[in-house]
């Protein structure tokens, strides 16, 4: 949200359902003093309360945590103004077929992970839920270079979630995650 301030938007509204993250942002913004940045204790499930409201929605690291990802994409589409843009970041599994993994309980030790699609599957989800001009603009394997332990983050991290013998697999034996970015538009 702070990076968006550079573009001088009229309003940036962050949905943050976790109270510790909500207050962390509030404290940081009290120092930054950026009046156009706001957050509310809301989640993506509250988007139906905002019909035709947003010019841009950033959905970052959320879609695979939703038990009904297609409903979530439809709710976002309804919350976008005509011509509005969705910027979506997600974990995916590698592959050229339009399929999604439905893990038994956890994926890379993360509970609450429902569906991990391939890039073609995610593209189809976007198209079939009504988005236009769907474009994938980045895809790469995840690695410990982007998610790792540090003196500030001492808990388990990426290297603990991946099979020690075969880095192409998660600890559960599923394909290891990749990261993908899509841009899509409401007609």
Predicted feature residues:
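Conserved SAM-binding loop of SAM-dependent methyltransferases across substrates and taxa
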Residues: 1-9
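Conserved SAM-binding strand-loop segment of SAM-dependent methyltransferases
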Residues: 32-46
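A short acidic, Gly/Pro-enriched loop at the edge of an enzyme's catalytic core
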Residues: 45-57
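A short SAM/SAH-binding and catalytic strip from SAM-dependent methyltransferases
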Residues: 55-69
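A short glycine-rich, Lys/Arg-flanked "PGG" loop and its adjoining helix->strand segment in the class I
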Residues: 70-85, 92
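Short, glycine-/aromatic-enriched active-site segment of Class I SAM-dependent methyltransferases
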Residues: 91-113
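Short alpha-helix
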Residues: 113-136
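A C-terminal cap/extension of S-adenosyl-L-methionine-dependent methyltransferases
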Residues: 138-187
């Amino acid at each position: 949200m702070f990076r968006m301030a550079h573009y001088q938007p009229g309003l940036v509204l962050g949905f943050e359902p976790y109270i510790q993250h909500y207050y962390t942002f509030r404290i940081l913004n009290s120092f930054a003093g950026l009046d156009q940045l706001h957050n509310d204790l809301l989640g993506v499930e509250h988007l139906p309360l905002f019909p035709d409201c947003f010019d841009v929605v950033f959905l970052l690291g959320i879609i695979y945590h939703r038990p009904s990802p297609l409903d979530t994409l439809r709710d976002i589409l309804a919350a976008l103004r005509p011509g509005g843009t969705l910027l979506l970041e997600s974990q995916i599994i590698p592959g050229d077929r339009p399929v999604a993994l439905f893990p038994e309980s956890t994926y890379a030790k993360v509970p609450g992970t429902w569906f991990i699609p391939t890039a073609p599957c995610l593209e189809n989800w976007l198209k079939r839920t009504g988005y236009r001009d769907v474009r994938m603009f980045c895809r790469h394997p995840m690695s410990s270079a982007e998610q790792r332990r540090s003196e500030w983050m001492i808990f388990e991290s990426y290297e603990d979630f991946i099979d020690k013998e075969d880095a192409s697999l998660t600890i559960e034996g599923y394909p290891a995650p990749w990261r993908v970015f899509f841009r899509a538009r409401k007609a």
